[in-house]
Amino acid sequence: YKDNPTAKRIAYRTEFNQEPKEMQPSNVVVDSIIADLKRAEILLTNIDPLNFEFPKTEDGNGGTGKDGFLEYRHKRMNLYAVKAMLARVYLYAGNKTEAVNYANQVIDGKYFDLIGDATDVLRSKEIVFSVYVDKFDQQVTDITNGTSYLIVKESFLNEMFDVANDGTNDLRIREGVGFDYGTNGIKMRKYKQENLWASTEGTVVLIRLSEMYYILAECAATPGEAAEFLNKVRNIRGVDPVVCTEANRLDEIEKEYRKEFY
């Protein structure tokens, strides 16, 4: 997009039919995505019930006795998921002003919190948008039982989480939280369905609150300001503060994306 915004890349559908659709230039696709999201924002404002809670126990109607469809809004396309996606696409398009605007709206909405609770494996209060996958536990079991799911070399994991600089206190790399460490290798716990609350089972996270801080870091006016946004997440994850310079800022942001979303 940045290097050649008028080059034709993908088709973008605005109608539900089987008719062939011509490839569209990148800038047209981005404009279309923004237009769709802005329309969704208008439609959801003052309509979305904004119920964002994963109870530890639940009844058949989402844990509150209310209509289950109106609960667990982070399992559906909700108003703040739309705002978060606008922050994403505006950053991609190079419009940092609007990227900051929408990232801050998600953070300042006070519906989500960064949490460091190791017992909440999915960090449910951070989930802005996710999807529910039926019988996901069976699919995960089939995948994780084989050796192909193993990380054989611990050195790879250490590089991924920058252990040489950050140590092993990071919540995301700890035994029983982020990974299981065994004699045959290391297994990622990202999709494992063990020890989850009933309300979080089958949940695949698509947008986390932490991403909004990373967007703000990339848009920050100075390296010091960028470091402040990164450190808000690092502090919750149990990692010491990082210092950013003009030379390393993007590298440090990339490292945090990698650790958070691996």
Residue positions per predicted region:
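Aromatic (Trp/Tyr) and acidic
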Residues: 149-156
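Active-site-proximal, Lys/Arg-enriched surface segment
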Residues: 160-162
